[in-house]
Amino acid sequence: MARENKKDLIGKVVSDKMSKTIVVEIVQRKMHPIYHKYLKVSRRVKAHDEREESRLGDKVRIIESRPISKEKRWMLVEILERSK
């Protein structure tokens, strides 16, 4: 059965040094359950960039995919904003 609704995330490219792979940092705001203070929670995921078109600092959108390697489970969909 194919799954239609794939997760998508928006983040910033923090590394593009690997071949056909980028590291994207995802920053989310979560509320602390007791203190009700908003915290920035970040995580880094590796994403597949087939055409090697994204650069360091770009804002990108990635979607989940089948496992491509040991750590890559995301693919680049589009570049939302180029770095300056």
Curated annotation (Swiss-Prot):
Entry's Gene Ontology BP terms: translation
Entry's Gene Ontology molecular function annotations: rRNA binding; structural constituent of ribosome
GO cellular component: cytosolic small ribosomal subunit
Keyword terms, alphabetized: Ribonucleoprotein, Ribosomal protein, RNA-binding, rRNA-binding
Pfam families assigned to the protein according to its UniProt record, in alphabetical order: Ribosomal_S17 (PF00366)
Organism superkingdom: Bacteria
PANTHER family linked: 40S RIBOSOMAL PROTEIN S11 FAMILY MEMBER, SMALL RIBOSOMAL SUBUNIT PROTEIN US17M
Function: One of the primary rRNA binding proteins, it binds specifically to the 5'-end of 16S ribosomal RNA.
Family from the record: Belongs to the universal ribosomal protein uS17 family.
Summary of subunit composition and partner proteins: Part of the 30S ribosomal subunit.
Protein name: Small ribosomal subunit protein uS17
